[in-house]
């Protein structure tokens, strides 16, 4: 495993050198063998637990990164990696660098009094969700390993501790730029923006202010595409703070996330999102808002005069809504296999969504049924039969293939994950987890054990998600 240092060149106080804290009895619980092979991570089995617990990393100059964040709209100027250590980066087969980070590896200078640890349940949840999202075709951070610490993490209630090994194409967040902007560190901002462009947007060849305007536009494009992909499968992030918004356009932080069952744009599962700020249907607005916060941070790189900088960036920010509407309409067209375009399509889609909400139909299973109905494989829900007569006139012989690629047959449902975690906690068995991950590996295909994980819960009104911190 060849680790390459990064981030230290950005600013003096951006990446603080720190080392993981040793744990009592590391035990490898989950290992992502295909991911390890993709990155040529050749750690022998007997050393994996000690390596990815942090116990073998004492000689490596790991770092904790600083960042700020708007958390539920309230600004915190100093957050940072309070329980994570960035070891460096590894190269994939395309020679692209990916950060490798330990999460739950002990307190850092950014811990703000926290213990720096992670409980086992949230660690397993991150493993399941990140790999499920990858299989669903959604840009995401990845999970290489989960290592039990052999120690108790004092949450409510006390739980076994664990360390997650996370891979990401970078950990550069909107909050990373806010952190340097708050300090007035223009040189650091430029270094960070140039690093982000180098890693994620190398096609940007412009110089001067145009370079950073192009960067902002590229981030917006990726955020639009990311949120549309979330909504295609019913994913609700739950904590879309600016510190959880990567400029790469990858999904990060699966703590309070959930999947929508019955369709409703107002769906919220997070226990702390009392106002529905991060509801399913509000995710585009929040992504737009977060991009505006990035733009504010980039002002010194665009023009010395704030008003002129804002004038240059405002049209780019305002373009988010139009881009989203185009991509969102295209998403519904693929989910319904609509042939060509028709002025009545908007009304057709709106009618379907109203029926889904009114009859509390399951989002995933309804679109699966519509897809399979084109080949006679499944019947359409009775309440949709009249609507389906109009829809079928808009399909053609290519519709099934288009719909099958857009509509998963299985998703990481909330109650399924809870069942997996419950079984693991009670018996220590990962059999159900591996069985589910095998099915989830091909979520758009019909596999042997698919039906076991397809059923929607009778109700999830009392289901709440929590941050694992």
From Swiss-Prot:
The keyword Transferase applies. Its EC number is 2.7.7.-, 2.7.7.108. It catalyses: L-seryl-[protein] + ATP = 3-O-(5'-adenylyl)-L-seryl-[protein] + diphosphate; L-threonyl-[protein] + ATP = 3-O-(5'-adenylyl)-L-threonyl-[protein] + diphosphate; L-tyrosyl-[protein] + ATP = O-(5'-adenylyl)-L-tyrosyl-[protein] + diphosphate; L-histidyl-[protein] + UTP = N(tele)-(5'-uridylyl)-L-histidyl-[protein] + diphosphate. Its cofactor is Mg(2+); Mn(2+). ATP binds at residues 80, 82-83, 103, 115-116, 166, 173, 253. Keywords: ATP-binding, Magnesium, Manganese, Metal-binding, Nucleotide-binding, Nucleotidyltransferase, Transferase. It comes from the Bacteria. The keyword Thylakoid does not apply. GO terms for molecular function: AMPylase activity; ATP binding; magnesium ion binding. The active site is at 243 (proton acceptor). Mg(2+) binds at residues 244, 253. NCBIfam families: PRK00029.1. Belongs to the SELO family. This is Protein nucleotidyltransferase YdiU. The gene is ydiU.
